[in-house]
Every structure is written in structure tokens, then in C-alpha cells.
């Protein structure tokens, strides 16, 4: 069973970039089969030409890089957690999660606005900069 819901263009592109990263990083054949199946089910959603412009593809590439950075940060944090090492590096890694997620949200919003997405995700956080 699967559920069909409306989501923003940026959300679909975000999900696809994460699935691409998982496909590159995960070797387990059962997990990989699930990842590829999910990816294939989402690809038709970004098939329209409006989502395939150079500008949108560049934003999607940036989004993938940000998501890859998040993957690396999370891996590093989990190693520190496993070692019970809550030093300055751990704190910087933890802080970098929300800095990097802010970049991610910005890119998703740019994609949504540039594609005319009917749905646009909004964030509401205190300004910390």
C-alpha cells in the first residue's frame, strides 16, 4: 500500500536527492531495492519540462550537496555519540545541523517559487545570526 499526497516541488526534489545519496551510500541489497523502488515512483512527479530547466537543475544539484553535507554531519555526530565524546567538535557538528538545514530550506523554497509550486513549505525559527 502507498499513500498519495500533494507536496511541493521542492519537497519532491529534496526527497529524490536524499534517495540518490542513499543509493550511493547503502550497499545492503534489500535496502537498495527499496530505495530504488521509491525513487522510481517519485521520478514522474518531476518530469514536466518546467522542472527540468537549467536553473532548477542547478538548484537541485545544490540541494543534493547540502543533503550530502547533512549526511556527513549526521555520521560524524553518531560516531561522537557512540564514543560518548561530547567535546567542542560534537557541539560544532550539532550546531551545523541547523545551519545546514536552513540552507536546505532556502533551496527548497527557491525551487518552489521558481517552479510555481502550489505548495510552499515555510519555516519559523528565531533569527540566530
Which residue stretches match the model-derived regions?
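Extended, charge-rich alpha-helical interface modules
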Residues: 1-129
Amino acid at each position: 500500500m502507498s499513500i498519495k499526497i500533494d507536496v511541493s516541488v521542492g519537497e519532491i526534489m529534496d526527497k529524490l536527492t536524499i534517495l540518490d545519496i542513499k543509493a550511493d551510500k547503502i550497499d545492503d541489497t534489500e535496502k537498495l531495492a527499496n530505495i530504488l523502488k521509491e525513487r522510481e515512483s517519485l521520478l514522474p512527479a518531476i518530469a514536466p519540462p518546467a522542472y527540468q530547466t537549467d536553473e532548477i537543475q542547478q538548484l537541485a544539484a545544490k540541494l543534493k550537496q547540502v543533503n550530502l553535507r547533512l549526511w556527513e554531519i549526521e555520521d560524524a555526530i553518531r560516531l561522537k555519540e557512540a564514543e560518548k565524546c561530547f567535546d567542542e567538535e560534537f557541539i560544532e557538528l550539532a550546531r551545523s545541523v541547523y545551519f545546514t538545514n536552513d540552507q536546505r530550506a532556502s533551496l527548497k523554497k527557491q525551487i518552489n517559487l521558481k517552479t510555481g509550486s502550489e505548495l510552499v513549505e515555510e519555516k519559523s525559527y528565531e533569527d540566530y545570526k
